[in-house]
Amino acid sequence: MRALCVKKVCGFLSKLSLRSSISCRRYYGDKIPNYGSYRRGFSNEEALILRRLSEGGLVHARHLLDKIPQRGSINRVVYWTSLLSKYAKTGYLDEARVLFEVMPERNIVTCNAMLTGYVKCRRMNEAWTLFREMPKNVVSWTVMLTALCDDGRSEDAVELFDEMPERNVVSWNTLVTGLIRNGDMEKAKQVFDAMPSRDVVSWNAMIKGYIENDGMEEAKLLFGDMSEKNVVTWTSMVYGYCRYGDVREAYRLFCEMPERNIVSWTAMISGFAWNELYREALMLFLEMKKDVDAVSPNGETLISLAYACGGLGVEFRRLGEQLHAQVISNGWETVDHDGRLAKSLVHMYASSGLIASAQSLLNESFDLQSCNIIINRYLKNGDLERAETLFERVKSLHDKVSWTSMIDGYLEAGDVSRAFGLFQKLHDKDGVTWTVMISGLVQNELFAEAASLLSDMVRCGLKPLNSTYSVLLSSAGATSNLDQGKHIHCVIAKTTACYDPDLILQNSLVSMYAKCGAIEDAYEIFAKMVQKDTVSWNSMIMGLSHHGLADKALNLFKEMLDSGKKPNSVTFLGVLSACSHSGLITRGLELFKAMKETYSIQPGIDHYISMIDLLGRAGKLKEAEEFISALPFTPDHTVYGALLGLCGLNWRDKDAEGIAERAAMRLLELDPVNAPGHVALCNVYAGLGRHDMEKEMRKEMGIKGVKKTPGCSWVVVNGRANVFLSGDKSASEAAQMVLPIFCGNEMLEEEEEKPLSLCHC
């Protein structure tokens, strides 16, 4: 009995909860199919009107409208207008248009609602037709102004603005914002200056525009001129400073903010993360959570935190897992409307070495960008097999990013043939793909093939990237192939309009000419450079130093300091090398001291070896040995190898034999089969006439199996480098190649009997 009673009560409550829906169905009958689909977001009567409008039942729709009672003080036309706007915003524009036609009454607000619906749905022909026929106010004109700006028709927008019979601050702001959005900052500034009155929105629009169009200095000036700032203003400036890398100033401004919202916090957290200050990003997030007026993170906050956790690497992988757990437990994944949060989590796991977790996320929701992230991580770990397996899933899509990643992976592994095979199969290759292939050929020392591929790239109608040229110039410099370097320089001049003064490219040209022995050409390019960075100065100083032009190198170093550029460790390596090759001991010691004390640059092992070389070349072997004894670290084989080599140069020094033997003993303790060390000691003994010791050392080399790597030389003929090893029987072939180039065939016949001397490296 009790069970029956409970059942009846439950049935009653169920019926009661459905009374409204049932009564509607009884009144209109069950002839309306898919009634439920029209209920989403609408009341019963709104859904029924929408259905009738959709079916063309205008009489029924009008009947329903007339039956709607006046709701309190709300006029019926206001309600109808609100309903029309609601239909238009939710995608039922045709139904909204029919409603507009059947409405018993309309006013200008109704017309503006319909006009806005047309514009938002990009039905511009209908929008213009209505605009021409309807009564207009400032809102109507502003709606059409927005439409023109959204279409990128800035000039038409300005013309329409000039025709407006009346304007308000919203109209002015709409035009300013539209011009900025279309990249016309100059015109936007003119309109901004002409505004009769400005509000904070006007100022914020200009500040944001300057920040996004490389005008941070102008944004700073406007920010300083503003009498009234709001949270948007402050947040824009924080974002701007972070965007341009001045995180310290961004944080100072953030701390001064009178109020903050989630966007402000996120701007600063993101700024830390994108500038690789990952710990600071996480610490600021914790501070945000402790704030009295704590705010919930949004999607951008979580994305930045995920990248910060990934940036901290393997050691902080647990932190990333905790973040993911928080995302799930707090339901934050529901804010990931565009999938960017999921991608950032994949990146986080991949960067932290938890590739299985990244792969698991990918399997839950496959995404091409996430797939590329994991492929890159597999390749970085040298796991070609897993990268290939994942690549097979996206191979048919011919996505350039994934294909280029695999090409790069094969090249890194030295598998040039597979890389080139994939390169040839990829349709619609872009400049990045070509550059990766060319760079890989250079990396695998296939310099002629790399230069040939550049020619193919140009023939295909693609303009090489500056990075492409830089790679090839680097290869020309590495092989001292001046002809190839000049050829690339000519291609640059032909393919780059008005010779784009790219700093990296100019630096590469300076370096290439210097390494190829054309120091005057290098200096000519350097002297014409409008902008010079530290790399520019370093390339030229190193070039002069390697050519034995110590005075010019040191004078250029002084010019660099006078220009306000700060030297770095590479700069000092160049000037110390210059001093070493010219025997300028006092100057070298002064520079070494200034490096540490004046510029607070910690010397590296190369700097210490330069100082050893400086002392040794000046014949001060004992001082060089004492210098090594005072080093702030335990010397390795390169240090003792340098000293041993200097003993070979100074074998006449009375201390040479003892120093050489001590250096060799330490060197061979560290590296028992070090070939250069054995050979250097043999040379010292030979110079001193100690042939018995030399013979003993060579015998020891034989027992240990120590073999000196033969020196090599090369000559470029018809664009191809021909390499010859020391002691190679093909030396006569080298003679046949080189002599016609320098002497001509007739001279070759005359000099046929004379031996050919080649430079070895």
UniProtKB/Swiss-Prot annotation:
Glycosyltransferase found in the keyword field: no
GO biological process per UniProt: mitochondria-nucleus signaling pathway; plant organ morphogenesis; RNA modification
Annotated region described as Type E motif, given as residue ranges: 639-718
Organism domain of life: Eukaryota
Entry keyword set: Mitochondrion, Repeat, Transit peptide
InterPro entries membership: E_motif, Pentatricopeptide_rpt, PPR_At4g14850-like_plant, TPR-like_helical_dom_sf
Protein family according to the UniProt entry: Belongs to the PPR family. PCMP-E subfamily.
Alphabetical list of PANTHER family matching this protein: PENTATRICOPEPTIDE REPEAT-CONTAINING PROTEIN
The protein, known as: Pentatricopeptide repeat-containing protein At1g32415, mitochondrial
Lineage start: Eukaryota, Viridiplantae, Streptophyta, Embryophyta, Tracheophyta
